[in-house]
Amino acid sequence: MVTLPTSLLISDCYMLFNLAILFGTLVAMEGVGTLAHKYIMHGWGWWLHRSHHEPHLGMLETNDVYLVALALVAAGLVALGKAGYAPLQWVGAGVAGYGVLYVLAHDGLFHRHWPCAPKPVNRYLKRLYRAHRLHHAMPGRKGSVSFGFFYAPPLRVLKRQVQARKHR
């Protein structure tokens, strides 16, 4: 039987702990993103987010300020982690990872801002795409549905919500 040095085992456990923080943050960011989208972007921060719901020319919109803020939070957490609060750098990496996935999927797949815009190919991506289209179906900031990014309720539920909100 081969025995491993204790330092190697501790190092492996430390890396597993860090990876758990990273992936846990990625998952938690869906909840944070959903709440921020619903209550900040469609609430008091609508003045910045409105550009995302209206036709515009060019690649940039005032809504991109939210992505810059997310990047600053991620960078700040990584910096704090490097300054001695080690787990925070992995939280920052998870926040940054969520931001990268957001840009790739949201801007590339949902809004097709990339030169070679891919189309959703599987049931999961098609559901997210359709939910996002329903989110944009309601004019203005009130009455929207599906504020999440990586999770969308079943389409039949969202369609019922849209119909109910149109008749208010």
PLM regions with names:
Residues 20-24, 90-95:
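Small-residue packing motifs within transmembrane alpha-helices
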Residues 32-46:
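Short, charged cytosolic
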